Amino acid sequence: MTEFKPIKEGKVREIYDNGDSLIMVATDRISAFDYILKNKITNKGKVLTQMSKFWFDYTRDVVPNHLISVDNKDMPEYFQQPEFEGKCTMCSKLTMLPIECIVRGYITGSGWASYQENGTACGIKLPEGLKESQKLPEPIYTPSTKAELGDHDENITFEQSITVLEKLFPGKGEEYATKLRDNTIALYKKCAEYALSRGIIIADTKFEFGLDEEGNVILGDEMLTPDSSRFWPLEGYEAGHGQPSFDKQFVRNWLKANPDSDFNLPQDIIDKTIAKYEEAYEMLTGKKL
């Protein structure tokens, strides 16, 4: 059996070269505040992989994506070992673009903190009188740079994203930046509408895109998982305060309340976290893992 070594290790994912494709493994690691926590969340990698597959299939008519297969039998023999079960994505090779494409449909988190200070979210002027967790009149696109492991992502304007891409792809910066923005908004609108019908509010999310060999913009990485998105229950939603969530915010809140934890979660928080991830998956897809 050929053994594989990762060519790249992120906070949560490991990437392996499979010749004309890549194998992306979603581990059970969890990160918060740009740090990898000491604990693993059992089954988390499976939730991320299967939820991304659901959304990639659902949005293929909007934007092409990198998904080839998540079926275990399609993987090289090495990835058919039990530890990889349900966590592997075979995907197309892309030249990834160094922009985190963030879209916000509701005012919360860092956007809410910024709005309280100066009436903007990531430099975008918003209407006066908004309450915390309120739905925005239209989703806003707030890109950021992609940080290396251990560094923090940095918010940038749309114009700055053009500059970043123009340096890498002379003559193509504005075209690529515009596609990233328009694709991000289109994907969010389609998926947020569907999620509402399943009882979940997608408050915000992030996408990552790359280029194929022909220079086409292709959706990559993960899609609308509890790691990359804020999911709130529609039932009981009311603007004016923070919302309960099905996502990593639960872990972030515990860490904020326990600053001396040294990024070490107690077992009950681990159990509640995976229960929330699995509940979100079942509500959105109508399937059990």
Could you describe each region identified by the protein language model?
Residues 103, 202-223:
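Conserved metal-phosphate-binding beta-hairpin within the catalytic cores
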Residues 1-148, 261-289:
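Active-site loop/lid in soluble adenylation, ligation, and acyl-transfer enzymes
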Residues 117-118, 123-175, 219, 223-284:
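Anionic ligand-binding catalytic core segments
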Residues 21, 96-98, 198-202, 214-217:
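Coil-to-beta-strand transition motifs
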Residues 93, 194-195, 199, 209-211:
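Short, conserved, surface-exposed binding loops centered on an aromatic residue
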